[in-house]
Structures are given as structure tokens and as C-alpha cells.
Amino acid sequence: MSTTGKGGKAKGKTASSKQVSRSARAGLQFPVGRISRFLKNGRYSERIGTGAPVYLAAVLEYLAAEVLELAGNAAKDNKKTRIVPRHILLAIRNDEELNKLMANTTIADGGVLPNINPMLLPSKTKKSTEPEH
């Protein structure tokens, strides 16, 4: 038997190599494969490039991290350890860019921003400096 030919070792991948997900390759937490599948099944285009789902996953992960950080700060300001929809709403509405991005979005159980028109507040009267008799 000769050592060359079809009976040799498999070329390319070694036996010890493991599969690495596209998310891990890109250094992301969001699932690149699932986003790719959604893009293909959604019929947004006839063809989807290989970089498109990676880029979209990165953008979605960044936005989620930004909202979660601001919502965590809002929860901490209210002395809470759990983020609730109210904290997410406060985070989005108090940030200028996120508010512009999510202007037409309603968050369930989020409530509204506290806002009282200054005209409706009681007027501040000047206190006299003279002592009363």
C-alpha cells in the first residue's frame, strides 16, 4: 500500500478543531446565524451578503447595551435593583438621540415623563422682611 492517495489524513480541518460560531468570530453576543436566517426568510432582498448579518447584529447589540446601561442607571437612581419598563422609558426619553430614534414607540407599562407646566404651579409670593407685630 502506498502512503499517498485517498487513504491519507483529512486535509483542511484537524480532528481537534471545533466549530466556531460567526458570533464568536465577530466577538458578539447577539446571534449572527439567527439574524442571517431572519434576513433570508424575510425576503428583504434576493441575496444577502455575508457581512450584512454581522453588521446588523453588532448594531443591535450596541443599541441594546446603550439602553440597558441607561435603564440600569435609572433603576439605580430610584434605588431599585431590577430594571422595569418604567426605567427603560425614562432612559430612552431622557437621552436625546434615543428619544429621536424611538419617537413613535410606545413602551407598555412605561408611563410618561413627569412634566408639569410652570403656569399650573403655585406662584411664589415674596415674603416681607418686616417682622409681624
Curated annotation (Swiss-Prot):
GO terms for cellular component: nucleosome; nucleus. The modification N-acetylserine is found at residue 2. One of its GO terms (molecular function) is structural constituent of chromatin. It is found in: Nucleus; Chromosome. The modification N6-acetyllysine is found at residues 6, 9, 11, 13, 18. Monoubiquitination of Lys-124 gives a specific tag for epigenetic transcriptional repression. The keyword Chloroplast does not apply. This is Histone H2A.1. It comes from Tetrahymena thermophila (strain SB210). The lineage of its organism: Eukaryota, Sar, Alveolata, Ciliophora, Intramacronucleata.
